[in-house]
Regions:
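Sec-exported N-terminal periplasmic low-complexity segments
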Residues: 65-70
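Gly/Ser/Thr/Pro-rich low-complexity, intrinsically disordered segments
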Residues: 23-50, 55-61, 74-462
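Bacterial N-terminal signal peptides that target proteins for export
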Residues: 1-10
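Repetitive helical segments and hydrophobic/amphipathic motifs
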Residues: 13-14
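N-terminal signal peptide c-region/cleavage motif recognized by signal peptidases
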Residues: 17-19
């Protein structure tokens, strides 16, 4: 009888021990990966993993009080992490031991479906700095990890009540061309400035730009841009220019460009924003208009430009058409930017493509015919976003460096959604991406120095 009791007791003890082991969540696998920004260690389990962390010197220990495990070691060779070991600590316990080569920031967090415990060890020093620049204007710098890559971002948030207004300006000074964004921002006393529209090497603006209701650059390709209808109403919308000149003989000419170099069979509209003169050669015909009446005609090229006048400069077939005009002729000009909102906007700057619409990622690179070097790949970026409450976001991210990989357009859109953007548009990026605060460049341009640009966007006093 005593023998039977002893056997039953032993069986009961064995069952209790098995139940205790079964209650411990088994860790199925230890795995690791290395990216530019971090080393990631993952513990896979069929059950949620409880943990308690402790760091002493260069050793991070993660106690797993209810997780059983077999001894495992990650196959890692990294400048930041020396070794990663999963160590059994009795039947119901185990420990994750991470030995570091240098002091690093880290983050530990559980995930579900499937159950995992993730340990991220960062190669770089994560940092956030925030500064109040003016009433309603905040600047935030971040060194962070985004999608497993390092990222440096520079964000200016402008609340609707701020006594500042966003306006375009020429980085070249008074006229069209290329120049130092930082120099112009300092000379104009701007609190904040960023680069904006695309341009060619001669400073030809590729896009539509309007300031104080006056159009100073145009592009026929429909592309997204920022529109300011008044001090309080701002939107992001498609913009596409079309314009005509109606000749007295009934011929209607299509205006193909504004304030840019004249090319073959072209018809370009110039105003005094461009330069003191049209800078054209003698192989064409130019007509100066005031109040839509012809006041001067020239075949010599390089016609002067004065405020209140417009010059039509034609080459080839368009030069031949302009030959029918005489002094005093009435030549009505029409132009539209494709919508009533764009036509009545006081301020307008196009870039492209659209990034965010109704709070969702909506990258329209193909629809807006963006060049492959813009549409593809990871690069420094400049963007503008609008939040539901009217807050304006000016964002620059660095790229092409060890501390910041840059973003794809899709990632840029995701980042802006994360910031709360309801709508957003991309501007010129790469080596052009630049943010200036109080006359000082705060980001790190990827060329290693400031690139001269054409159009900037700055915060002007209302």
């Amino acid at each position: 009888m005593n023998c039977k009791k002893l056997i039953l007791s032993l069986l009961a003890a064995a069952l209790v021990a098995q139940a205790a082991v079964a209650a411990a969540a088994p860790i199925d696998k230890l795995r690791s990966s290395v990216s530019a920004a971090r080393v990631r260690v993952v513990l896979d389990s069929k059950e949620p993993i409880k943990y308690k962390e402790a760091k002493q010197g260069l050793v991070l220990e993660v106690a797993l009080p209810e997780s059983s495990a077999k001894a495992q070691q990650a196959a890692l060779k990294d400048a930041a992490v020396k070794s990663v070991r999963l160590v059994p600590d009795g039947r119901r316990k185990s420990r994750l031991v991470v030995e570091l080569n240098r002091d690093c920031q880290y983050k530990i967090y559980p995930l579900k479906e499937p159950n995992r415990l993730v340990v991220d060890i960062y190669r770089l020093q994560l940092e956030t700095r925030t500064q109040q620049l003016a009433g309603g204007v905040t600047y935030t710098y971040k060194q962070e990890e985004f999608g497993g890559r390092p990222l440096q971002s520079y964000l200016v948030s402008v609340a609707p009540q701020a006594r500042l207004r966003l306006r375009p300006f020429s980085a070249a000074g008074m006229y069209n061309g290329r120049g130092s964004l930082a120099k112009q921002a300092a000379q104009r006393g701007l609190l904040v400035a960023v680069n904006a529209s695309y341009f060619d090497r001669d400073g030809w603006v590729i896009g539509n730009v309007k300031d104080n209701g006056e159009l100073i650059a145009m592009d026929e390709t429909p592309r997204s841009g920022y529109l300011q209808l008044n001090d309080r109403q701002q939107i992001i919308k498609d913009i596409a220019y079309s314009g005509t000149a109606q000749l007295p003989n009934g011929q209607r000419l299509e205006i193909k460009g504004m304030n840019r170099a004249r090319i073959a069979n072209d018809l370009v509209r110039f105003n005094s924003y461009y330069a003191p003169s049209t800078k054209t050669n003698q192989y064409g015909r130019e007509v100066k208009l005031k109040n839509n009446h012809v006041i001067a005609i020239s075949t010599a090229g390089n016609m002067t430009l004065e405020p209140g006048t417009v010059v039509l400069s034609g080459h080839g077939v368009n030069a031949a058409a302009l030959a029918s005009l005489r002094l005093g002729d009435y030549v009505p000009l029409t132009q539209t930017l494709g919508s009533n909102a764009a036509d009545r906007a006081q301020v307008l700057v196009s870039g492209g493509p659209l990034l965010v619409e109704q709070g969702r990622v909506q990258v329209r690179a193909a629809e807006e015919q963006m060049a492959p070097d813009i549409a593809r790949g990871r690069a420094p970026r400049t963007a503008l976003g609008l939040k539901k409450d009217g807050t304006l976001l000016l964002l620059v991210v660095d790229g092409r460096s060890a501390t910041s990989s840059g973003l794809t357009l899709e990632e840029l859109a995701q980042y802006l959604v994360k910031l709360g953007a309801e709508s957003a548009v991309n501007f010129d990026g790469g080596g052009s991406s630049e943010m200036v605060i109080n006359g000082r460049i705060v980001n790190k341009p990827s060329d290693g120095r400031e690139r001269y640009v054409s159009i900037g966007l700055g915060l002007f006093t209302k």
